[in-house]
Amino acid sequence: LPISVKTCVGAEHCRFGTQHSMDTGILLEKMLFDMYAPHKVKLAVSGCPRNCAESGIKDVGIIGVDSGFEIYVGGNGGIKTEVAQFFCKVTTNEEVMEYSGAFLQLYREEGWYLERTSHYIERVGLGYAKSKILEDEKGRKALFERLIDSLKNAKDPWEVMQTKEPVKQFIPIAVEA
């Protein structure tokens, strides 16, 4: 099932931006583009607390603040909107990748088929997820390592398209007169 990462323009192009949200979003997208999960996974990175990318209602939402990033998990848009719950605060892009990646791997390993992260968090409790990731550094690093290991052979579909010869829409047919 697909993943998507939505970003706002962040500090690069917005006077309110406190963090470079597009850079962080690109890093997340490249890390996770071929990830399989129990259900679709939506991520968002907002460059400031104004939350233009709607990070507060995504499976994993990253919100830039003056001192780094706040990570929210378990949000859901749509008819039954669920506001994501505050998970932790980090300072670097590397920490964003590690903490959000560890959470997604925990969800991949323990989530039920067709269960969104909001229902997963409702079932196991936010405290459980925090204990596995925030309170257990070795466990977090192991979860993140398993995620990266599972994605190491993924091929970027855009890169494959760029290396092949362009496909022609119409191929001439030789006709004998």
Predicted segment positions?
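Flexible, glycine/charged-enriched surface loops at secondary-structure junctions
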Residues: L1, A37-K42, E109-R123, R140-S150
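Small-residue-enriched alpha-helical segments and adjacent helix-cap loops
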Residues: L1-D66, T163-A177
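General structural feature for long, well-ordered alpha-helical segments within catalytic domains
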Residues: S4, H20-L28, T92-Y99, G125, ...
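A glycine-rich phosphate-binding loop feature that marks nucleotide/adenosyl-phosphate handling sites
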Residues: V5-C8, A44-R50, S118-A129, K152
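Generic secondary-structure signature for well-ordered alpha-helical cores
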Residues: K30-A37, G101-Y113, L134-K138
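Mobile "lid/hinge" segments at catalytic clefts and subdomain interfaces of large enzymes
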Residues: K42, G47, N51, G56-R116, ...
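Extended hydrophobic packing segments that form well-structured cores
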Residues: A129-E137, A174-A177
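Charge-rich, low-complexity terminal tails
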Residues: L143-A177
